[in-house]
Amino acid sequence: MIRKAKAVWRGTGRDGAGNLTTDSGVLDATPYSFKTRFENEKGTNPEELIAAAHAGCFTMALAFQLQAAGFTPTELSTEAAVTLEKDGAGFRISQSALTLRAQVPNLDEPAFARMAGDAEKNCPVSKVLNAKITLDAKLI
């Protein structure tokens, strides 16, 4: 399986702007720029997209683990907070902090913690990130 996205950029790093498009069409010339990345202007940025990918991948991985164990979650809600920090002359993603709140009937805390930890370690996005990954998982 191959998934594709395209970035188009015009101008300098600080003053230019670009757009992102995915083959699925979910992103269609979605704008991004220095200001959307570093100054909170409306638009997206690579780190936000990585956070969305990590949250979605982890949550689906956990849903599959729960299904295999015979559990059906009422709701799995995951937030990923990706940290971008200075690294020499450039920047690096140093961390992705996952916060999960899960409603899973009849699941005990030890089994939940084990499955959440396994999902964090084994989701494809976790595997591709060269960053510290933390998980705060609570069964509610």
Residue ranges, per PLM feature:
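Extended beta-strand/beta-hairpin segments
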Residues: 1-52, 59-140
